[in-house]
């Protein structure tokens, strides 16, 4: 098994057939349980890896072929990748998990870490082969995922910010107003600052997220 690229929180290894994801950090057990539950419920409805086995801190998943969204984005395919990310996100947000989703409070299944960072695509067709990394999934406002995908592009792929129009076109709705998106980005950054603070109080991760909060707060539409 070799360590898989683009894992940012946990320890994820694979051999081309299966993937072992071992959860690290605060709430590791709950995040593993959450990811397992969502993957099981979404199987056959959204492209997600199959769950083969669940141990206390590890999930064994089927390996899904595809190229990581961030690699394809940097290879010059930003419009196609972001359009596919938008279309896949719409499918996620219209899933009815149980009687509570789609209820009149407007909450949907929020992925919780959505963006080209957690999507694999077929490099020939740009079809999404898998949406990965459901450990932060919850019921919430669709803007959370819309804003976070935008944040990933603004922070890590600033040359492609203009292609976010393809993301919203793929999703099929005009972008929510900028102040609402920016507030959602800042809320998520603060939640991640808090997560790193619980993991290693006063550590590099905390400083990193504080810096990112300052940067995000300075952005204009
Ligand atoms: N089922 C899978 N098939 C193929 N690659 C995977 C699979 N699961 C994870 N990966 C690869 O491992 C990386 C890290 O997995 P992920 O669930 O995103 O963990 P993390 O929470 O650490 O980001 C992914 O970005 C992807 O490149
Ligand atoms: Mg990930």
Where are the regions a protein language model picked out?
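ATP-binding glycine-rich loop module of kinase domains
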Residues: 2-33, 40, 71
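Conserved kinase catalytic-core helix
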Residues: 42-46, 69-103, 109-112, 117
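Active-site beta-strand-loop-beta-strand hairpin of nuclease catalytic cores
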Residues: 14-18, 121-129
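Helix-rich C-terminal or lid/interface subdomains of diverse kinases
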Residues: 9, 56, 66, 148-221
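Non-catalytic scaffold residues of the protein kinase domain
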Residues: 9, 45-48
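Short beta-strand micro-motifs within the conserved protein kinase catalytic domain, predominantly
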Residues: 50-58
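A glycine-centered beta->alpha junction motif in the catalytic cores
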Residues: 24-25, 57-78, 91-97, 189-204
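Active-site Asp-x-Gly
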Residues: 124-166
């Amino acid at each position: 098994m070799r360590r898989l690229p683009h894992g940012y929180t946990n320890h994820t290894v694979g051999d081309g057939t299966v993937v072992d994801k071992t959860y690290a950090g605060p709430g590791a057990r709950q995040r593993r349980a959450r990811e397992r539950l969502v993957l099981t419920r979404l199987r056959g409805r959204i492209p997600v890896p199959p769950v083969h086995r669940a141990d206390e801190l590890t999930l064994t998943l089927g390996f899904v072929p595809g190229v990581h969204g961030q690699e394809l984005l940097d290879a010059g395919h930003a419009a196609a990748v972001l359009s596919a990310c938008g279309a896949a996100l719409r499918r996620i947000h219209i899933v009815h998990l149980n009687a509570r989703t789609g209820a009149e409070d407007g909450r949907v299944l929020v992925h919780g870490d959505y963006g080209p960072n957690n999507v694999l695509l077929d490099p020939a067709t740009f079809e999404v082969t898998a949406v990965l990394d459901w450990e932060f999934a919850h019921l919430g406002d669709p803007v959370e995922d819309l804003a976070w995908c935008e944040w990933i592009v603004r922070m890590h792929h600033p040359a492609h910010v203009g292609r976010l129009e393809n993301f919203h076109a793929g999703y099929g709705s005009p972008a929510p107003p900028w102040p609402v998106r920016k507030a959602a980005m800042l809320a998520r950054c603060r939640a991640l600052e808090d997560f790193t603070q619980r993991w290693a109080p006063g550590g590099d991760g905390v400083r990193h997220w504080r810096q990112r909060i300052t940067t995000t707060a300075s952005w204009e539409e």
